[in-house]
């Protein structure tokens, strides 16, 4: 099975280390453009753009980067409860048309009650999923050419429709991640690709089985993806040293403060991430080559695959054997790590290439020509 590999735009900040301004860099439009263009050239299928009050607006970032990229797809956040589903569908269709069919959408229900209250959303966890289900039914329906009437508990629309359809039919693909039962049911009924954060394979297998069974009861099939950081180096020893350096500036006080902030979240996925590391820098390898260090201070995806190219590829293939076909990866700092992933990891994967990308097993630069006319030996592939 060919794998789809996406990268990540760090609109909330970037740098060499977690928890310190040392080695940090300004994340402005020029820098985001560098990352997007690198991902485009290197053969990543798309980029995830995060959402939340700590991030730049994902829609505006995507719109600004579409003209300076050629094939790259942009996975943009949909926020039920924050915007009308009909307006969101119109925006989605416009972005899809103007990008030439390069728009993907990520349904985000939110997990921080404090942030959600600041955005005017005062719903419980269960109510947010009720509202998200109503939102998604309308959003998918109008994008698919239907005229939608819905009198829901949270949303009511009459005669909702679009005049200008999206390029991707019946609608641009809808991604979604969540770990609660309500999230699994929403995924089974409404979404095209279910994303999980990087838990050990056995836990991921359980989630996939549950979503797959629920989808079957709705007469549907769902694709699966996983969101992971990655630390890949020429040797596994170098990769683990890089992991240690990434959290080398974190002290117990910083970790405790971050974990206290994350503890207010009602996200089941966030609770599962926290359980992997327990707020401690000890015993962070929670599964072979799966490291939970990022989650000590970062909300959301908190685990990384660590190793040399063949080792990380082998772990990815273990997830693929469970049914995962899409990997959304990231690494610090994101510009440099995009090249490391392309050069050290891509040769060991069967990649689904974006349209128009051709290469000799990898899209990254093949090296300097020797003696004016001799091409370097091709990298070993597994």
Swiss-Prot record:
It comes from the Bacteria. Keywords: Flavoprotein, FMN, Monooxygenase, Oxidoreductase. It catalyses: an alkanesulfonate + FMNH2 + O2 = an aldehyde + FMN + sulfite + H2O + 2 H(+). One of its GO terms (biological process) is alkanesulfonate catabolic process. SUPFAM superfamilies: Bacterial luciferase-like (SSF51679). Pfam families: Bac_luciferase. It is an enzyme of class 1 (oxidoreductase). CDD domains: Alkanesulfonate_monoxygenase (cd01094). Its EC number is 1.14.14.5. GO terms for molecular function: alkanesulfonate monooxygenase activity. Catalyzes the desulfonation of aliphatic sulfonates. Belongs to the SsuD family. This is Alkanesulfonate monooxygenase. It comes from Azotobacter vinelandii (strain DJ / ATCC BAA-1303).
């Amino acid at each position: 099975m060919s794998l789809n590999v996406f990268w990540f735009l760090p609109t909330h900040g970037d740098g060499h280390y977690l928890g310190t301004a040392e080695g940090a860099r300004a994340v402005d439009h020029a820098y985001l453009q560098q990352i997007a263009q690198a991902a485009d050239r290197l053969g990543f299928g798309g980029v995830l753009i995060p959402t939340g009050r700590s991030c730049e607006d994902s829609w505006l970032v995507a719109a600004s980067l579409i003209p300076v990229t050629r094939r790259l797809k942009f996975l943009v956040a949909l926020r039920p409860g924050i915007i009308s589903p009909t307006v969101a569908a119109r925006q989605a269709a416009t972005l899809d048309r103007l990008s030439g069919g390069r728009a993907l959408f990520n349904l985000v229900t939110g997990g921080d009650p404090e942030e959600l209250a600041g955005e005017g959303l005062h719903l419980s966890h269960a109510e947010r999923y009720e509202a998200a289900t109503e939102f998604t039914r309308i959003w998918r329906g109008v994008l698919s050419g239907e005229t939608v009437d819905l009198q829901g508990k949270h949303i009511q629309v009459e005669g909702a429709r679009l005049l200008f359809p999206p390029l991707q039919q019946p609608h641009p693909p809808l991604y979604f991640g969540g770990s609660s039962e309500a999230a699994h049911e929403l995924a089974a009924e409404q979404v095209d690709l279910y994303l999980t954060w990087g838990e050990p394979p056995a836990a991921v297998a359980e989630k996939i089985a549950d979503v797959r069974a629920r989808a079957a009861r709705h007469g549907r099939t769902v694709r699966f993806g996983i969101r992971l950081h990655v630390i890949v180096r020429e040797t596994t020893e170098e990769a683990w040293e890089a992991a240690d350096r990434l959290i080398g500036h974190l002290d117990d006080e910083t970790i405790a403060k971050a974990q206290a902030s994350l503890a207010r979240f009602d996200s089941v996925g966030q609770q599962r991430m926290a359980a992997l590391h327990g707020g401690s820098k000890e015993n962070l390898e929670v599964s072979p080559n799966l490291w939970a260090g990022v989650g000590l201070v970062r909300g959301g995806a908190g685990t990384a695959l660590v190793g040399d190219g063949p080792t990380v590829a082998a772990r990815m293939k273990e997830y693929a054997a469970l049914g995962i076909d899409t990997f959304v990866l990231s690494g610090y700092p994101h510009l440099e790590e995009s090249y490391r992933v392309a050069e050290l990891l891509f040769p060991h994967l069967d990649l689904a290439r974006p349209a128009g990308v051709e290469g000799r097993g990898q899209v990254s630069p093949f090296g300097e020509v020797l003696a004016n006319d001799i091409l370097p030996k091709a990298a070993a592939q597994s």
